[in-house]
Amino acid sequence: MTKTEKKLRHYITKAIADYKLLDKGDKAMLCLSGGKDSFGLLKVLHGLIEDKTYDIDLHVYTLDQSQPGWDDSQLRKYLDDLGVSYEIETKNTYGVVIDKVPEGKTYCSLCSRLRRGNIYRYAKEHKMDKIILGHHRDDLIQSLLMSILYQGQIKSMPPKFVTQDGENTVIRPMVLVQERDLIEFAKEENFPIIPCNLCGSQENLKRKKVKKLIQDLALENPKVPSNILNSLSNVLPSHLMDKNLLNSLEN
């Protein structure tokens, strides 16, 4: 086991323990997009199940969105060799996105909503206890700033949440993992990564701008990323302007 994998194991098991993400006997589906993050999470979590750290029934779900150039042959081989239960489901969400999004606009928002809808539907149909997503620490940091700058809300990606209908529980075991470690791990493991030819081809996305902003700030103060992350668990309601929060503090 490489140093990088040991590091990933440490932070993933810490998040699972700290936020009580998994329970014994869980039937859990890991959403494998074909990118470095979900591949890294799968490899580490599969190893933790193999060595009996976790007693869960793991199923891998991949959504083929019918994008041009999609080739999952190497992904299938990887999953077969790993020996995990999996399903690659084909849905033409690409056609919907191309039809609905005006030329010049970014696809990410609609594409992610359609993908999320299919994930939730599949989880319900197969009675999954948990939906496992591969978002990492940097995703949380960027999402917080994006919510503030572009939506006027203070929110990000929680380690665990239940959907509004109460049907699905979503968990993110990599909330403490840095993207740079996942990049290194992907190089070490040579994962058969499938690039996104839809949103990946679009420049000047908001997330890229926010990522660059954080990187620039970190050059002046390396603690900026960790400070942003820590702010998500160090909330001072009395110092905010939410009337409902302030009223609840007074009552």
Swiss-Prot record:
Q: What is its EC number?
A: 2.8.1.-
The name this protein goes by in its record: tRNA-cytidine(32) 2-sulfurtransferase 1
UniProt keyword list? 4Fe-4S, ATP-binding, Cytoplasm, Iron, Iron-sulfur, Magnesium, Metal-binding, Nucleotide-binding, RNA-binding, Transferase, tRNA processing, tRNA-binding
The EC category is transferase
| Role this protein plays | Catalyzes the ATP-dependent 2-thiolation of cytidine in position 32 of tRNA, to form 2-thiocytidine (s(2)C32). The sulfur atoms are provided by the cysteine/cysteine desulfurase (IscS) system.
The primary gene name is: ttcA1
Is Repressor one of the keywords UniProt gives this record? Answer: no
Organism of provenance: Francisella tularensis subsp. holarctica (strain LVS)
Mainly resides where? cytoplasm
Q: Where does [4Fe-4S] cluster bind?
A: 108, 111, 199
